[in-house]
Amino acid sequence: PQNVHQAWQLYRNGADLGVEQMDPALCHPFVPIRMIGVFDTVMALGIRLPLLWMLTEPRFRFHDEHLGRHVEHGVQALALDETRAAFQPLVWDSESHPGQIEQMWFRGCHPDIGGQLSGLEYARPLANIPLVWMMTRAEELGLPLPAHWQSHFPCDPTAPSVGSWRSWGKAFLARAPRLAGADPSESLHTSVARPYPGPALLTGALAEKAPEHPHRRRKRFARPKAVPTVEQADMAAPAASAPPGG
């Protein structure tokens, strides 16, 4: 326990010199990791409630979210529909790991991607999509899985989402659409509708998958057309009643 505490303090305080001086007998040699798979990493540690998160976040800022040089493959599933500002995603920069990082965007919010459904089983088929994708990637990289394992995880891209407004989610008033496509390692999953209607903003290589008119999803809030005046209605009536070619 003492060694674990010492290692934790060195990691937390960023004491590189202290790490170098640790007894080699207490440390493992360089161990390569085939794959790290994460679900919508948001760096949202501590109490993620309005205002209270500001009190706890400084305690966790020391965490290093970058992939280590001993990681061969980094795979991340990301939520397109999450809008809570406190849940901004930590998207990896693939420049330091060219060709080794894959980040896939899926329909759904943070709890959908992570499988935190709170008993809402109707959302399970949507949450299973990133799960099956992640397990498939792990299997391709050598993780042995039972035969026909996919049959245990039915998927449906049209299934309802848990959403981000349920329960305490209503208290998160600070909202902003996510930005997808800034890194070359980002892609849209095949289950996402094309053109993608939002709310996330697509940029980079994903920009071409956005609708030509990105605000068209708001058309149901458009103002109604002006009601014609009596004179306009009287003028239109004879034209409407006239026979074709008359």
For each feature predicted by the language model, list its residue ranges:
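Active-site- or binding-pocket-proximal scaffold segments within functional domains
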Residues: P1-G246
